Amino acid sequence: MKNKWCVNVVFLFFFGICVCACTQDSNSSNNSRWSEEKIQEWYDNQPWLVGCNYIPATAINQIEMWSAVTFDSEQIDKELSWAHELGFNTLRVFLSSVVWQNDATGMKKRVDEFLNICRKYSIRPMFVFFDDCWNPESAYGKQPEPKPGVHNSGWVQDPSCSLRKDTLTLYPFLQEYIKDIVRTYAHDDRILMWDLYNEPGNSKHEETSLSLLTNVFRWVRDCKPSQPITAGIWDYNSSRKNVLNAFMLNHSDIISYHNYDNEARHAECIKFLKMLNRPLICTEYMLSLIHISEPTRLR
């Protein structure tokens, strides 16, 4: 199993080079990818990055976090003070196209307020746009109550699954959303980086997420942000993720990844991702149902 996993990672590296060579054109999202030297210089100028995936305790999902009625700056301030005391200097935070669609101006004001709270505690977040995980549908307004004992009971995919078939309608809206947010904060030093898509292909989307993944990289590149961009690989064993992973590995400025494996296999992951000669950031790890008894999961 270990050898098979290693082969898959190596394959992604070389397969990705071939994919990029075959798919690039004059409008390629790879045209303005940061060079290895530029991203290494950027990374060398950062502190040792330590943080967590963050949503306030009073919000069940991204919509509730950013909606005007439920945005809880007092709670956020309290929790970020705790994060600062723990030594955290970054957070991974999910945005919401649903809130932006219904209240773009208000949402950006709340994002600005959130960034000011972050700066107060010397925290620079990375923002996530899209997500293929958990509940397939979402709606603006009051969100469901949490289900006791159910992990992520109210978390929602973004965009909703029901919207994805009509790309002629969906993509222009999402492009406007992405470009509005990125252009607003493209040179804002309160933001560490942009994480464009959480676990593309999850929830049985598989390679159907490639189109949106490709487009979001292009839309963000069009805005020429001063911050690096990434999307993290997360499934190393499924052949149906090879094209997605290859694209992310060959278009991200900085390589990010998720790993819920044991310590030895995580070390193997790092070893092979270093072949890409770019800095690495692990944006999800820790608790695993497979290795729940291992003390290293809480390091």
What does each of the following model-derived ranges do?
Residues M1-V10:
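Bacterial N-terminal signal peptides that target proteins for export
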Residues V9-C18:
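Bacterial N-terminal signal peptides
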Residues V10, S26, L298-R299:
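Compositionally biased non-globular segments, especially hydrophobic aliphatic-rich helices
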Residues V19-S32:
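Bacterial Sec-dependent signal peptides at the C-terminal "C-region" and cleavage site
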Residues N30-I254, H258-E268, M275-R278, L289-I290:
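Active-site mouth of glycoside hydrolases
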Residues H291-R299:
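Single conserved hydrophobic/aromatic residue that forms the stacking wall/gate
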